[in-house]
Amino acid sequence: MTKHNGKYYFQYGAPGTEFKVYADGVYVSDSPLGPFTYQQHNPMSYKPGGFVQGVGHSGTFQDLKGNYWHVGTCMLSLKYKFERRIGLYPTAFDPDGVMYSTTAFGDYPCWNADYDIKNPSDRFTGWMLLSYEKPVKVSSTDSIYSSSNLTDENMRTYWAAKTGEPGEWIEIDLGAMKHIKAIQLNYYDHKSVQHNRANDLYYQYRIYSSDNGTDWTLAVDKSDNDKDVPHDYIELGETLDARYLKLENIHVPSGNFCLSEFRVFGFADGEKPLPVRNFKVARDKQDKRNAMISWNPSSDAYGYNIYYGIAPEKLYNCITVNGADHYDFRGLDLGTTYYFAIEALNESGRSALSKVVKQ
């Protein structure tokens, strides 16, 4: 329950903990004991697309600057159906008292609570994904756990080396010189036998950069790390210009050297994508809760953000789609009119938002 401007916002986790559409809804009342009314904008926290999916079982709090945040559990469900990760998303109340959580670019680098930013959508740094579907070389591969899984933007697939020994490595080719601002290493467990806590529950590694794939320079040194950070995010102090990155294993707690994703963020030289053309939304005549969303693919885009909401100026929810030109959407309410828009994403930035479509 969150109290804001005299109203009480009762939040709850909807069914579907084990699915990517797991979300939180909200009811609103003038009294803490009700009666409560279903908020027309629902779910209030929703993330069915992108690298990290799902945001339910959540809680809302304020930071020291008064900004609201929604911390929720995100679907993984790979080793076990209720396997989760934790996501943190900026949250706000609009002038009409509508509570919403911004999950657009929620799995990209964003400005944290140290930055006094009132509009949740302004927390995105603008650093684009540089690693999507880029070619990867590895020191070894265990069974079916292919190196292509390292750059597919899917947290539920992973690559594993044959061992967890020092010297196992990953090399990624970004295709051209890129301006790198941050790196995220998403470790995973493969053939791990560790139970409970241990003194060596941490990852140690080095990252090297290169212009030509032959001559390497040390870029990140975590050889003495002693913190348990399985989704390690490294924000570089200065922009790193490089084409190749190489990750060298030094220590894993148990099992094989294994990652679900090697993510790189920053900028590429070039133009931002053009606005998306032929954006269409068709609600199912038999079941208005469903809609088929389609568009013409942009030749220079790797992904798209679909925004929707209950008014043209309230497009608060976002669905990220990579490498596709359609989305089968099954998350609408009966009896509610919705508005949709889309933007294209490439390594140089974001396109202008499309015209808003009413359905």
Could you describe each region identified by the protein language model?
Residues Y27-G50, D96-A104, L218-D221:
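Blade-edge beta-strand/turn elements of extracellular beta-propeller
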Residues G25, Y203, P230-Y233, G323-D328:
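Short S/T/G- and acidic-enriched coil/turn segments that sit immediately N-terminal to beta-strands
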Residues F329-R350:
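Beta-strand-rich modules
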Residues F19-Y27, K79-L88:
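Structural motif
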Residues R289-A301:
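Conserved aromatic anchor
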Residues D152-V220, P230-R277, Q286, N296, ...:
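Aromatic, loop-rich ligand-recognition surfaces of beta-strand-rich domains
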Residues Y208-S209, S298-I319, G323:
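Extracellular low-complexity, O-glycosylation-prone stalks/linkers
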Residues M1-G16, N67-L76:
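Hydrophobic core segments of beta-strands in well-ordered, beta-rich domains
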